[in-house]
Amino acid sequence: MKRTTRSLFIKTLSAPALACVLVSPAALAQDSAPTFYADALPLFQKNCVACHKPNGPKVGGITAPMSLMDYDQAKLWAPMIKNALITGYMPPWGAHERHRGEFKDERYIEDNELATLVAWVDGGALQGDPADTANNSGMVAEADGGVIPDSGWWIGEPDLVVQFDRPVYVEDSIMDWQPTVQMPVPEGAHTKPKWVSKAELAPGGPWVHHIVSSHMGVGVPGRGPFSYPEGWGVLMPEDPFITVNMHYHKDPGEGTAVTDMTRAGFLFYEDGTVIDHVVETNLLPHSGWTIPPGDPNFEVNNTFEIEEDIYLLSMGPHMHYRGKAMRYEVVYPDGERETLLWVPDYDFNWQFLYEYKEPKFLPAGSVMHMSWWFDNSTQNRWNPDATAAVEYGPETTDEMANARIYYAPTTKRGIVVGGEIPADILETAQKEEQTRRERANLLDQSQDDLSWLSEDSE
């Protein structure tokens, strides 16, 4: 079976989407058919135009295919909008309904909310009177999650921007390539260690499968920026380079070559801020299994013992094209069992980082239980090859069972930004960058650098 690359770009163009929709009860009470200006546009403004706007921002390297601020475009895409809503393709969010209210930037839609936009489409996607939006001018600013600033970065104007010193060329013959590349820091821009409060990765295109870095987190399709709670942060030592592991994935063949200029932006804490919790991460990969050919519901399980009291900040499930569902659970020392995250319909193109609104306390002696399900059958239309026996591996046509977590010990460090940095924190941050650099095969297309699979999981 010939493999077809599944990219968010292709999926987005074939089934365009809304970011999320909400509607007031008054809209449902109208006797006449809903109109764009009176009913649809206010909903788009409040929940969708952060992405669906002219020259909209990239999310995981992808830009929304239409602007929902424009009536002509919204009407043109109206049938697809309806399809995206009723099929559950949008809003893009993997966490089960049971988690409503737990995570930041959640995207859920009520039945009556969906009904209003479907009614607008079924009623002929009527335009209505532009004056009907006069009282809705403030809705964008008030919407949860906000609208991307004029800077083009979700985090706002960065304190530091880094990028490759030259475009990375991904040749025609390449399907999967995982080089490690250095991003030079502009001279004089980073002369002392800084505490990162927010970090944003801007992949150069949909062929960027992932980006892994010690200081800026992980970039995968559909994932937004890292924004740490007040008093939480990551130390970025002064250095002329930031080293990143890239994974490029595309269909090989004549004319398929691409060039990448991935960027990253950082916001730093101001002097005087107190850092109580230094963020740590663990990939928690699980290997040593084989998915049989044609198996529609293959399950693997793993555990991780928590050795000290921690605050769990966020969770990031990761599988490839056969990924079907994923669950994090915890068994507390007293035997109580709790589901931390249930993703019943995993989508490789929307690999969210599920961040708690309030970091969750997990006491020492707790055990995390992770379960992954895979669909290697012909019923999975994204399956590269249902006849293959599939193992854990780095290529996109392999599979992975990773359960990355971000967390911090509960003991407060009380580190004052601009003051002395504890030796253990500085040493760890410097070692992470140096280790990544020493393991790297910098821009050597003869070899992949797969060290990221084990570096933070030992």
Where are these regions (language model features)?
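N-terminal secretory signal peptides that target proteins for export/translocation
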Residues: 1-10
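Bacterial N-terminal signal peptides
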Residues: 11-25
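Hydrophobic/aromatic hotspots within intrinsically disordered, low-complexity regions
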Residues: 22, 28, 450-453
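Aromatic- and Gly/Pro-enriched helix-to-coil junctions and flexible linker segments
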Residues: 28-186, 191, 198, 204, ...
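Extended, polar beta-sheet/loop recognition surfaces of beta-rich domains
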Residues: 69-89, 382-388, 411-417, 422-425
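His-enriched metal-coordination microenvironments in redox/metal-binding proteins
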Residues: 120, 146-413
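Glycine- and charge-enriched low-complexity intrinsically disordered segments
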Residues: 414-443
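Long, low-complexity, intrinsically disordered segments
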Residues: 442-458
